[in-house]
C-alpha cells in the first residue's frame, strides 16, 4: 500500500479490556451512536478492521527467518490484540509480491517468511490465519496485490520458479520496481488464477486489493507498455483509456470469478481516496490532490462502485480534518454520496500510522484526531466501518490514538456487516 510517510499511552486502557466470551458476546449494534440514522444503520453491523502487512516484513513476521512457532506466535498476538480492541476483521496480506503465504501451485513462497523466496516455511500461514481468526470471531480478508512483482528491478533475485522469470515478456521495470504488464490478457488471467487458488481452498471472508494498479507516477520515467498498446489498444482513443479498460476488465472479471468459485466471499478494494479533483472533473471531489486514481493509476474507482463490480470499497482517506489539499471531511462526503444507492459497502481506511509521528502536521499529534474521524463518519449514512493501517501501529499506539478510538466508539463488540 502506498502510505507516503512510510506506545505506551494506551497501555492502561488496553490492559483493562477483557477478552472472555469473544464470539458469543458480540452484539448487533455499538453502544455509541451519532446522528444521521446511525442506530438503524449499525444494527446491520460495522466493520472494524486492521491491515496486517507482510511485504518487507512491515507488520508480520517481525523479521524473516523466524521459526514457524515464532511466526505463528506473532500472528496469534495480532489476532488476540484485535479481539481486545473489539475489532472484528483482519486484512491479512497473502500475496505481497507475486508470491504466496500459502502453498500455491502458481507462485513461490513469499520471502518475508524465510528470507528466501520459494523456500517452504514449514507451515501454512493462510490456513492458520483463517482458522485462528474465525475461532476468535474475526473475519479474515485475504489481501492480494495483483501486479507488483518485486521492490527491485533484478529478475535474477526472484526464485528460479517465479512466473516472472519463466515469462520475462510479462514484466516491466518502472520506478525501481518490477510489475506485471496489465495490458497483456495472459497476465490478467494468470494473476486471477493465482488469487482464486486461495479463494477455492480456504474459507476466507473476502478478497481485498489495495491501491496498486498501474504504478504511481515517477517523474521523468515512462511505463514502457507501447508494444502491448499497439497490439491490443487500437479500439481506444488513447493509451490512458486503454489502460483504464485493462484495469476495469481485471476488476470485473475477478468479481465474477470469485462469485463463481465460492459463494459468500466478498470482493473489496482499498484505493487511494481521490478519484479526480473537481478542477479536473466537475464530478470529482473538492480536493487538490497530487494524485488522481482515474488519471494517474488508470483506476476508475467511481465506475467500479457505480457498476457494482465490487462488494465494498475502502478509500484510504489518509488526511486530517481541515487538510488544505484534501480535507478528510470533504473526501468522506464525496465517497458517501458516490456509494449511495449502489449497494456497495463503504469502509474508510484510517492513517493510524500518522498519529504521533513527529514528521506529520499538528493535528496528527492530537490523540483525538482519529476519534473525530469516526464521530464525523457516523453522520454519513453510507459509512459502515473503518480499517486501520496498520497492525504494528495498533500495537505501538504511540500517543494513544487507537485507545481513544476504542474508548469513544468501540465499547461493545459487534459483528461485521454482511
Where are these regions (language model features)?
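Substrate-binding cleft of secreted/luminal carbohydrate-active enzymes
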Residues: 312-322, 342-417
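Active-site-adjacent "subsite" loops/lids of carbohydrate-active enzymes
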Residues: 57-69, 147-197, 295-296
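Aromatic-lined substrate-binding rim segments of carbohydrate-active enzymes
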Residues: 96-144, 239-254, 261
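N-terminal secretory signal peptides and thylakoid transit peptides that target proteins
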Residues: 1-14
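Glycoside hydrolase catalytic-domain groove-lining segments
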Residues: 234-283, 293-358
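Glycine-rich, aromatic-flanked loop segments that form ligand/cofactor-binding clefts
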Residues: 45-49, 87-95, 125-171, 208-210, ...
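Catalytic domains of carbohydrate-active enzymes, especially glycoside hydrolases
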Residues: 73-98
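Aromatic- and acidic-residue-enriched segments that line the glycan-binding/catalytic groove
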Residues: 102-114, 148-174, 212-234, 280-289
Amino acid at each position: 500500500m502506498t502510505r507516503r510517510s512510510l506506545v505506551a499511552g494506551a497501555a492502561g486502557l488496553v490492559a483493562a479490556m477483557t477478552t472472555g466470551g469473544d464470539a458469543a458476546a458480540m452484539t448487533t449494534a455499538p453502544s455509541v451512536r451519532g446522528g444521521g440514522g446511525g442506530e438503524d444503520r449499525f444494527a446491520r453491523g460495522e466493520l472494524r478492521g486492521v491491515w496486517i502487512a507482510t511485504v518487507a516484513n512491515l507488520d508480520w513476521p517481525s523479521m524473516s527467518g523466524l521459526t514457524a512457532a515464532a511466526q505463528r506466535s506473532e500472528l496469534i498476538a495480532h489476532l488476540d490484540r484485535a479481539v481486545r480492541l473489539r475489532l472484528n476483521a483482519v486484512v491479512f496480506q497473502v500475496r505481497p509480491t507475486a508470491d504466496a503465504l500459502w502453498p500455491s501451485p502458481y507462485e513461490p513462497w513469499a520471502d518475508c517468511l524465510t528470507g528466501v523466496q520459494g523456500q517452504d516455511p514449514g507451515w501454512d500461514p493462510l490456513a492458520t490465519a483463517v482458522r485462528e481468526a474465525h475461532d476468535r470471531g474475526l473475519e479474515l480478508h485475504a489481501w492480494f496485490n495483483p501486479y507488483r512483482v518485486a521492490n527491485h528491478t533484478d529478475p535474477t533475485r526472484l526464485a528460479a520458479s517465479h512466473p516472472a522469470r519463466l515469462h520475462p515478456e510479462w514484466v516491466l521495470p518502472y520506478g525501481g520496481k518490477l510489475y506485471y504488464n496489465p495490458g497483456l490478457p495472459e497476465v490478467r488471467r494468470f494473476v486471477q488464477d493465482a488469487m482464486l487458488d486461495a479463494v477455492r481452498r480456504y474459507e476466507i471472508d473476502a478478497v481485498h486489493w489495495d491501491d496498486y494498479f498501474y504504478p504511481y507516477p515517477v517523474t521523468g520515467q515512462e511505463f514502457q507498455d507501447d508494444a502491448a498498446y499497439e497490439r491490443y489498444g487500437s479500439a481506444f482513443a488513447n493509451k490512458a483509456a486503454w489502460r483504464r479498460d485493462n484495469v476495469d476488465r481485471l476488476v470485473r472479471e475477478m468479481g465474477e470469478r470469485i462469485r463463481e468459485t465460492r459463494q459468500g466471499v466478498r470482493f473489496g478494494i482499498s484505493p487511494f481516496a481521490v478519484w479526480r479533483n473537481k478542477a479536473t472533473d466537475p464530478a470529482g471531489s473538492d480536493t487538490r490532490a497530487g494524485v488522481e486514481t482515474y488519471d494517474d493509476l488508470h483506476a476508475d474507482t467511481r465506475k467500479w462502485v457505480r457498476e457494482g463490480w465490487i462488494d465494498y470499497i475502502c478509500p484510504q482517506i489518509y488526511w486530517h480534518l481541515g487538510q488544505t489539499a484534501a480535507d478528510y471531511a470533504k473526501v468522506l462526503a464525496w465517497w458517501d454520496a458516490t456509494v449511495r444507492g449502489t449497494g456497495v459497502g463503504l469502509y474508510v481506511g484510517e492513517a493510524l500510522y500518522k498519529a504521533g509521528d513527529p514528521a506529520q502536521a499538528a493535528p496528527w499529534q492530537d490523540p483525538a484526531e482519529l476519534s473525530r474521524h469516526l464521530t464525523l463518519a457516523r453522520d454519513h449514512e453510507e459509512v459502515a466501518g473503518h480499517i486501520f493501517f496498520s497492525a504494528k501501529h495498533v500495537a505501538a499506539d504511540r500517543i494513544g490514538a487507537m485507545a481513544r478510538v476504542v474508548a469513544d466508539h468501540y465499547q461493545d463488540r459487534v459483528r461485521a456487516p454482511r
